[in-house]
Amino acid sequence: MNSQACLLLQKQLKDLCKHPVDGFSAGLVDEKNIFEWSVTIIGPPDTLYEGGFFYAIMSFPQNYPNSPPTVRFTSDIWHPNVYPDGRVCISILHPPGDDPSGYELASERWTPVHTVESIMLSIISMLSGPNDESPANVEAAKEWREKRDEFKKKVSRCVRKSQEMF
């Protein structure tokens, strides 16, 4: 299968292997499926997630790059912008167009110029600075705002658990 999506994903994977980017690594879940990647995100320095190794699956649609991939953490992670099932909720992973809920500008949403690298750097940035205005995990957002010590304890447990799994 030599679709535009396949060729683009093969190129991005090759580029990441040749020129690794600080903060994450990526590879295929199964060598026969270019549309499903396994990524490891290293907790960013000077954040609550520092020292953690968080695993996620990045799934690309057949019409990539016209539609965004989905990213789902398979490691436990406590964060306002990660749904309880692990799905990442950031603007650039939302389909192009206007936001029906009015939280995001069209310019903040997915565009075909985004790459695996830009997505991963956005997720690392999300770990560094949670957005509690439109949370995916309401309980985590509430703790982030009102009970920061509890939030820190839960994140510390996730970091420790990720280190044990590494």
Curated annotation (Swiss-Prot):
GO terms in the biological process aspect are:
protein ubiquitination; ubiquitin-dependent protein catabolic process
InterPro entries the UniProt entry points to:
Ub_conjugating_enzyme, UBQ-conjugat_E2_core, UBQ-conjugating_AS, UBQ-conjugating_enzyme/RWD
Q: What induces it?
A: Up-regulated by syringolin, a cell death-inducing chemical.
Q: In which pathway does it act?
A: Protein modification; protein ubiquitination
Alphabetically sorted, this entry's keywords are: ATP-binding, Nucleotide-binding, Transferase, Ubl conjugation pathway
The EC number of this protein is 2.3.2.23
Q: Span of the secretion signal? A: none
Q: What is this protein called?
A: Ubiquitin-conjugating enzyme E2 13
Q: Coding gene? A: UBC13
A Gene Ontology molecular function term of the record: ubiquitin conjugating enzyme activity
State the organism named in the record. Arabidopsis thaliana
Q: Reaction(s) catalyzed by this protein? A: S-ubiquitinyl-[E1 ubiquitin-activating enzyme]-L-cysteine + [E2 ubiquitin-conjugating enzyme]-L-cysteine = [E1 ubiquitin-activating enzyme]-L-cysteine + S-ubiquitinyl-[E2 ubiquitin-conjugating enzyme]-L-cysteine
For this record, an example GO cellular component is: cytosol
Q: Name the family.
A: Belongs to the ubiquitin-conjugating enzyme family.
Domain of life assignment = Eukaryota
What does it do?
Accepts the ubiquitin from the E1 complex and catalyzes its covalent attachment to other proteins. Involved in the formation of multiubiquitin chains. Signal the protein for selective degradation.
Query: What does the record give as the active site?
Result: 89 (glycyl thioester intermediate)
Q: Which residues form the UBC core domain?
A: 4-164
